[in-house]
């Protein structure tokens, strides 16, 4: 049998593992893998949710998950074998089961709506958009038990809607799923001596940087007693630019995120911050009394209306354009694949008719087909799950009705196919675009008090189910490349959903407790501002027809934003079709739009991270390629994990001993000195 891939001189991957027998189901779904999954699930949910609540988006954490999963499970397996508690060998298949558990857990945590839809239901976010609130459109507290049930319902909807597509996407259409392919190659390499050495080096780097980041967070904490205190409020470029939110807050998280994001994303964010906070908003402030009258920073009929609706317009327009491009591309590719299939009468028969197919592909397809699940099982399960959700969702949230849930669950498999197919082609899930468009439709459909909460629920269900589904297919691609049973992967996805359903609501409660007094979670002054929460709520308001109360020329500026977005996206598309390089230097309009609403401070930290990586690559390219993701993960995890002791200190009323704050010279210092003297304190004279 031919054991080569393309070029006979190249060694087959599966031939290298030929001596290792394929493990059974019980050797894949092991208690030790589940134990490590619980540990890593908690850590990465904590870190991922924290980043999302701080910045509005989460960089790809698949690589840190993959490296740490391999390292921790290998160490645990070796110790258990040393203590003679098990004879089960550590295999790449068990490694893949662990990875899909953790990634599914993380994906559900960051797409379930904690930083978007669920936070957007509360009074804190609602007051940033209006002063006169309808209590039927407000939910300030959702019991933890309800959150657990809600997350399990939407997570399982994503898993069940994905299963019927497994063979179609992986075998019939042979889609690439780039991230899944990379992880598959990585796992295969890790289970060789050379790959294990690199993995060990990466893990050591993560722990070293983690310790430094954690220590830096402790040091910063001592100077942060009070609002606007500490290094996070350091006026790097002076107090005037600080008022415009242009400063470096020395956040290891943002620097790490900047190292993981492409340079075009980092500088796109900075460009958006300069355009909005540097030019547009100062100009609009000069129109106070002419274009708008209110001084309220939250009302949509004031300056806030421009901020919210211009940013929403940019994001939604860019998302819809990219969605149309992806759907068109997917339809064209789908047509060509169907034409090829009609000529070959299906891939299964193609295997038997083409004995020259390389050894790796034949081996992988045989494994996949031998352990696939009959189609009627997931279809029947999804129908039953839809019925359960139609009863459970309205019982927990009376703003949404059973027929709203039924229509949404009917659309999820159809839209999920489009989203997963596009992910297989481009590695890009547009679930967030669907999550912005669906509440607009449902808000217009419901159009009565309570519609905002119902539409936000629709947004959360849409994003979580579609994203979990598409990313589960990425994991299945990795499983296909490592000869891991699809049934074991589905078991891992179910376990990941169950784990996330319990862990992520508890972590969310910890973040609520950790928020500083006077700056609760979701507020603009909070450590966790959840910048997208207001945007999602604003989309629901627009859907209900609430644009009539906007300030003067707001709609016209939104139309200009639409036209600019169309022009930029058209230029990018033409550049791609013509083979120019111009599109490589044009950032996404969604990236540019984020600072319009969230502020500009984090963009400088991210650019700093990107510049550090660029400098590192100039000095030592190989070291940067191997270890940069590990350094970024250490920076993010170190600061992220300090949130736990910080929250505990806050719960027990243990406050930092000092406040480092910067004030302009003159009368302000005298006022502060007078205040401190009346309180028994003093400002040291210099």
UniProtKB/Swiss-Prot annotation:
- Enumerate the InterPro entries for this protein: OPT, YSL-like
Indicate how the chain sits in the lipid bilayer: Multi-pass membrane protein
Q: Looking at the keywords, is Chloroplast present?
A: no
**Where the protein is mainly located, per its record?**
membrane
Q: What does the UniProt keyword field contain?
A: Membrane, Transmembrane, Transmembrane helix, Transport
* Regions that span the bilayer: 27-47, 53-73, 96-116, 151-171, 203-223, 264-284, 308-328, 373-393, 405-425, 441-461, 488-508, 554-574, 596-616, 629-649
Q: Where in the cell is it found?
A: Membrane
| A Pfam short name | OPT
Going by the entry's taxonomy, the superkingdom of the source organism is recorded as Eukaryota
Does the UniProt entry include the keyword Transport? yes
Q: Which cellular component appears as one GO term in the record?
A: membrane
Q: Which GO terms describe its molecular function?
A: oligopeptide transmembrane transporter activity
Role according to the record: May be involved in the transport of nicotianamine-chelated metals.
Tell me which family the UniProt entry assigns to this protein.
Belongs to the YSL (TC 2.A.67.2) family.
Q: What is this protein called?
A: Probable metal-nicotianamine transporter YSL4
